[in-house]
């Protein structure tokens, strides 16, 4: 879940949507904006290290053991499982409320574990060759399709409607790390929240002061 949130909101969010530029400072305060850079190699280190992020989206999409595969991210990907001589393709819009996973090459016997995102609290279903098999599920866990023989005609569908929720976290971490605030007294931790829609952090426009913000979910 954490990997998914960072990937969607931070790493992908650091890439300019229209042309290749990245941002180093990712401000999230009121009326903040992204300073795009790397027009030249000297402009910011993200011209190099930041570029590497965008070829690694798939790194945590799948994990395997001797007789099982874990689907960790729902993104368009192709997994070539050499040990099983099986190719698995995942097709979906991204970010996805529905994903289709197909065995496109080979045959093998293994279990498939499908991640149930923490935000999937209003419905989650898995269909194997058109038949629903998710009798129960628990967010922040995996649903397992037991070990079976797979072939190139098998199709798994994952349905997970996005939900609105608030994701809370500590604020002023640089102060919390010292345990002191500006008045040199013991620091009381502060908390802030982000309005989320599924794994996506939402933003608002046209607000010039926090007191004017109205949240209705």
Regions found by a protein language model. Give the residues of each.
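Glycine/proline-rich low-complexity spacer/linker segments in large multi-domain proteins
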Residues: 5, 160-217
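Beta-strand-rich interaction surfaces with strong enrichment in secreted/lumenal proteins
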Residues: 88-91, 101, 134, 144-148
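A structural signal for short secondary-structure junctions
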Residues: 92-96, 104-108, 117-119, 137-139, ...
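C-terminal beta-strand-rich structural cap/linker in extracellular carbohydrate-active enzymes
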Residues: 110-113, 145-163
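Solvent-exposed beta-strand/loop surfaces of large extracellular or lumenal domains
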Residues: 121-146, 166-174
